[in-house]
Amino acid sequence: MGQKVHPIGMRVGIIRDWDAKWYAEKEYAEFLHEDLRIRKFIATKLADAAVSTIEIERAANRVNISIHTAKPGMVIGKGGSEVENLRKELNKLTGKRVHINIVEIKKPDLDAKLVGEGIARQLENRVAFRRAQKQAIQRAMRAGAKGIKTQVSGRLNGADIARSEGYSEGTVPLHTLRADIDYAWEEADTTYGKLGVKVWIYRGEILPTKKNTEKGGK
């Protein structure tokens, strides 16, 4: 039975960059655990701020954090008060100087994590899983997606036997490395247990098509 490789991990170093941009030898484990603490803290603190990606860079005793969000106003706060409080709390958490950069997500309907979160929250609010997926697909295609695929797994409608059901529209070329495919998975806590939500969104090609540079042809 064929299994799918993680679409983002497969493209790292080709069209995707790392979310953690630092190098360490002896301090590797320490920095890795610190990254996990930072990500967990931000995800909890900004749970309602539509946060997608958190990028972490390190230089000497300084940590630069880029937060990609669809609601920058909620993260920044009035006069920058919220982001300043967040910076102070992260300074305390890490013991290092923290700089926070807020990046606005212009089209949240093309971000797999935010789409997945939206479907998961709807499932928790007892919206039918087929309806939640189809609405998300329609919004993504209207926003300019070339293709989208969704899948919900678990005890659908409270069935005794867990199963998976998914929908797709357009094309999602998982094997094409130059294809900009965003992928995310989320969990929905329902009265019947957890449901898993997976989302793949194809946003178009990034690298230009390869030119024919062959020499000495006919």
Curated annotation (Swiss-Prot):
The GO terms this record gives for MF are: mRNA binding; rRNA binding; structural constituent of ribosome
Q: Which GO terms describe its cellular component?
A: cytosolic small ribosomal subunit
Disulphide bonds annotated for this chain are none
Q: What does the record list as GO biological process? A: translation
Q: Which UniProt keywords apply?
A: Ribonucleoprotein, Ribosomal protein, RNA-binding, rRNA-binding
Against SUPFAM superfamilies, the record matches this protein to: Prokaryotic type KH domain (KH-domain type II), Ribosomal protein S3 C-terminal domain
**Record family assignment:** Belongs to the universal ribosomal protein uS3 family.
Can you name this protein?
Answer: Small ribosomal subunit protein uS3
| Species lineage | Bacteria, Bacillati, Bacillota, Bacilli, Lactobacillales
Instruction: Give the encoding gene's name.
Output: rpsC
